[in-house]
Amino acid sequence: TLLPFYLGEKDDASYAIKPTCWPGLDIIPSCLALHRIETELMGKFDEGKLPADPHLMLRLAIETIAHDYDVIVIDSAPNLGIGTINVVCAADVLIVPTPAELFDYTSALQFFDMLRDLLKNVDLKGFEPDVRILLTKYSNNNGSQSPWMEEQIRDAWGSMVLKNVVRETDEVGKGQIRMRTVFEQAIDQRSSTGAWRNA
């Protein structure tokens, strides 16, 4: 994980990169131990053991490896800890998946309000990511609330909402059971061509 970099024990992030079976796609895995940054990062900063402000450590890590990649995707937990603040400060574009469901929509509203309040106290060094909303769990079934929720979300966030949506499907979960991605599923393992395409 990036924990040793976050704690000032490594100078670059290349040690954490792991190849995958797909050419050109590498990952840096994470685990629960990475949550140590929530309790230890500020202490390391106070001791003078970090090369940058605590909220800029992920940006610094990415800068050490960015020359090897065209695109870097970061997945973050939906909380407001120092890890998420690092993601916000490291991202050029921040895509926030928001299910087309009422409770998820209200949670996203609260998340953005809290994030805005929190970032008022953080020096972003003149950088602010482009924030976009991605509608997920979208259903076209009769009686679905998704079309109505899409209208509410687009009214609230306007051009921040991406045009495309992620449709609700069981194909991803079925692939996980078989330890395969949706791209690796055999044709006879798919519910239907349409459901597979939605995945």
Regions found by a protein language model. Give the residues of each.
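P-loop NTP-binding core
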Residues: 1-199
